[in-house]
Amino acid sequence: MKQAQVLTKEEIKKVIKVCELTKHADRNKLIVYLSFWSGMRAIEIANLRVKDVLSADNEVLDAIALNKTQTKGNKGQTVYIGKALKKELAKYFAKFPRIAEAKQSHLLRTQKGNFTSITIQHLFKHLYTLANIPNATSHSGRRSFITELSEKGVS
C-alpha cells in the first residue's frame, strides 16, 4: 500500500486557510489541527468525546487517553496535546460553550449526527481538493506529524 503524502508547512497553511472558507470553519480547522498537530487517525478524531479532552472543571487536558474502542488495532493509547493544539481546543470550547457542557457527546458533529472515520476521510479529501493538493489523504496529517517528530530526533 502506498504511503500517505507528507505535506510541507506551506501546504498545511494552505489547508487551514481553505478551512476558513468553509461553512463550519472552526470545526474543520480543529479536525485538521488534531490530525497534523497530534498525529491522530481519522477513526480517533471521529470517536473523540468532549470528556476525552476536557477535565471536569472545563480545562483542556494535557493528554487524551483513547480506549481500545476509539482506536485502530483494538488497544488504547495516549495522545499528548501540545501547547498550540491546547490553545486551539480552548478557543473552540470558548466559542462553543454548549459543546463543552455535553461531556459525554462526541467532540465533533455534523448536521446529521456524529462523524465517522469515513466522513472525516471525505472531509479531508474535500479540503485537499479545495487546497489543490491532489495526492494527500486523511492519513497525511498523521504521517506529516510523525515525520516532523522524526526529523527533530524524537523517537
Model-predicted segments: where are they?
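Flexible interdomain linker/hinge and immediately adjacent N-terminus
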Residues: 1-13, 110-111
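N-terminal core-binding DNA-recognition domain of tyrosine site-specific recombinases/integrases
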Residues: 4, 23-26, 76, 114-119, ...
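C-terminal catalytic core of tyrosine-transesterase DNA break-rejoin enzymes
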Residues: 37, 144-155
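Conserved tyrosine-mediated DNA breakage-rejoining catalytic core shared by Y-recombinases
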Residues: 47-76, 80-85
